[in-house]
Amino acid sequence: MHLIHKILVSLLFAAIALLPLQAQEKQEMNKKSNMKELRVKKVSAANVPVQAIPALLDQEKVDFQPINIVNWEAFPYCPSVEFRIAHTDDAILLHYKVKEASVRAVAGADNGPVWEDACVEFFSVPAGDGVYYNLECNCAGNILIGAGAERKGRQRATQEVLDKVQRWSSLGREPFEERVGECAWEVALIVPYEVFFLHNLTSLDGKTITANFYKCGDKLQNRHYLSWNPIDLEKPAFHCPQFFGTLIFE
């Protein structure tokens, strides 16, 4: 009986030791089950100017996807935001549509604090090596691009790289202070693969990558942090590739 008791005690301790691991595995499974997937259509945009991208995506019947997940109760405001994405032989095409209670475009140059303005963002891991890129664009078409495996120590794109991104904004390209009152705006971007400056990316044909899409406005009257794929963190954070969804490129 003493031996059986010792065996039972050992089994009990082994089971207890496994509980944190099982909980962690369950959390990982839940995280994966919440991840969204999106098929990215390939289109031809040869000689198409950036301002014509919305019309091209209409013609190609590329659907909009909502950016409408409010991840943090402290920031409940949820403007109407949607995006659509396609790709070509040499670039990613992005188109955002927004309706919100105010807009702001104080960051008047690239690599400035565009996240403080009315801002849409595209974060992605294009090469599967853990390095992710953050492309952030305010409502006047000024952008910021960073790259790295973590939030700290990120490398900013040079102006030469930033200039390769073609931008169109329905509000024009001039900076302005906050305008209060419901406003609808759009931006379109042509993002050539060479913008992923830490990699030698030449095509996304047939590839699957992870990514997330965001809307924020740190200094708008209604501060908010929306995402396409949900983020399970206590405080607002977009630099969290563990919560990216999946993009499947044709």
Regions found by a protein language model. Give the residues of each.
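Structural preference for beta-rich elements and adjacent junctions enriched in aromatics
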Residues: 25-250
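Positively charged n-region of N-terminal signal peptides that target proteins for export
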Residues: 1-6
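Sec/Tat signal peptide C-region and signal peptidase I cleavage site
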Residues: 21-22
